[in-house]
């Protein structure tokens, strides 16, 4: 299966992605992470109004194979969470970069927050180095 890495996104080495539109960030997990986890069975996300701090876990995702913490690429306040994905996490795999988003966050300092993220090209290169995808 050919994995997609949309060019308009930024990625973390822990496999979360961010799409920034002004001061609003959409956060999700990459197709690679979903492929590695397998069938998703549980998703825990923060509540609307909660604060996120870049580098600190904001929730977890579990599959039949593993459980992983989720990390925000940015700091900010949760303004929306994808309730449908909490109810049926297995459908995240159907469209991870579209309907499978996890959170929307109002970012405190959009220009400063993305410096530790990877471009699609760099993310793919990292994965090729690790896994030979």
From Swiss-Prot:
Residues 24-106 form the Lipoyl-binding domain. Binds 1 lipoyl cofactor covalently. The glycine cleavage system catalyzes the degradation of glycine. The H protein shuttles the methylamine group of glycine from the P protein to the T protein. Belongs to the GcvH family. PANTHER family: GLYCINE CLEAVAGE SYSTEM H PROTEIN (PTHR11715), GLYCINE CLEAVAGE SYSTEM H PROTEIN-RELATED (PTHR11715:SF3). The glycine cleavage system is composed of four proteins: P, T, L and H. This is Glycine cleavage system H protein. It comes from Crocosphaera subtropica (strain ATCC 51142 / BH68). The gene is gcvH.
């Amino acid at each position: 299966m050919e994995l997609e890495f949309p060019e308009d996104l930024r990625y973390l080495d822990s496999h979360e992605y961010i799409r920034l539109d002004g001061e609003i960030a959409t956060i999700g997990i990459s197709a690679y992470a979903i492929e590695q986890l397998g069938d998703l069975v549980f998703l825990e996300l923060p509540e609307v109004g909660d604060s996120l701090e870049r580098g600190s876990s904001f929730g977890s995702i579990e599959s039949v194979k593993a459980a992983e913490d989720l990390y925000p690429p940015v700091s900010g306040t949760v303004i929306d969470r994808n309730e449908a994905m909490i109810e049926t996490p297995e459908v995240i795999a159907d469209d991870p970069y579209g309907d499978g988003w996890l959170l929307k966050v109002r970012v405190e300092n959009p220009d400063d927050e993305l410096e530790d993220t990877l471009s699609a090209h760099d993310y793919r290169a990292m994965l090729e180095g690790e896994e030979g995808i």
